[in-house]
Amino acid sequence: SQIGLLINASVTRDNFEPAVSVGVHDRLELPRHALNFDITNACLGFVNAMTVASTMIDAGAIDYALIVAGEDPSPWHRTAVRILNNPDSTREDVLAQFATLTLGSGAAAAVIGRADRHPEGHRIVGSVSRAGTEHRNLCIGGEADQGMNTDAEGLLKHGLELVAQAWEQAHQDGWEWNDMTSYVTHQISNAHTNAIIEAVGIERERIPLTFPKWGNVAAAALPMTLAECAPTYTKGDRILCMGVGSGLNTALLEIQW
């Protein structure tokens, strides 16, 4: 009854309209006063939702928010397999569909509330974001039967450039993120992880990896990884969530445990 906002941040959905959030709202029997909507921003949606929810809480509009993301890419898997099984498929088809085949299924949820009511909680400290929307055509996902076409090499190159720009801007703004307890990144591949390490100079040992087990779970990947690592964190630890999504957009968000 205290939830004032529900945000669904998933990429995959069963239908174009209405918003996925309305089904979640109904099944959870949330109160009628609870605002609900979707934030869709590729794999960055959950981090964006955390920022929006925390801003609304700080503004006094709500006391608590529930953020959810559930991903099921299996219809896109089937389309990718159909395309690649075509006798006329080419090397370019393989490259365009490869990223689709690395997607995994999973779900995550988070409740965000007012810090003054929960001094023992994990505090969202602040965030920095950057947009590189000139690269919006590097990954195009349509309806499930149309599939998703991805320029994986281009996404890696320009995505990491954007992360590096956000990192530098954060430093200029006074954020000291060079010695965080943990860097929870979007989970894609070893190549992506290595590129982040090189781009911003962080230690590999501080980056938890879940993609070998779950694959790339789109918007749920980062919060699932955060939940997996939660038992290892202690009060006072500083966690940097490093989200990135096709489009291109990136957001770096600090949580103090």
Model-derived features: positions:
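Conserved active-site "lid/cap" helical segment
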Residues: 1-4, 140-179, 191-200
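Acyl-CoA/ACP chain-elongation machinery
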Residues: 61-80, 132-138
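Condensing-enzyme catalytic core mediating Claisen C-C bond formation in acyl metabolism
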Residues: 86-157, 244, 256-257
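Glycine/charged-rich beta-loop-alpha catalytic/anionic-binding loops adjacent to active sites
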Residues: 2-7, 28-39, 88-95, 144-147, ...
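Claisen-condensing/thiolase-fold acyl-transfer catalytic domains that form or cleave C-C bonds
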Residues: 12-14, 31, 38-61, 160-164, ...
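Short beta-strand segments
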Residues: 9, 40, 65-71, 112, ...
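Short coil/turn connectors at secondary-structure junctions
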Residues: 2-4, 31-35, 59-65, 97-98, ...
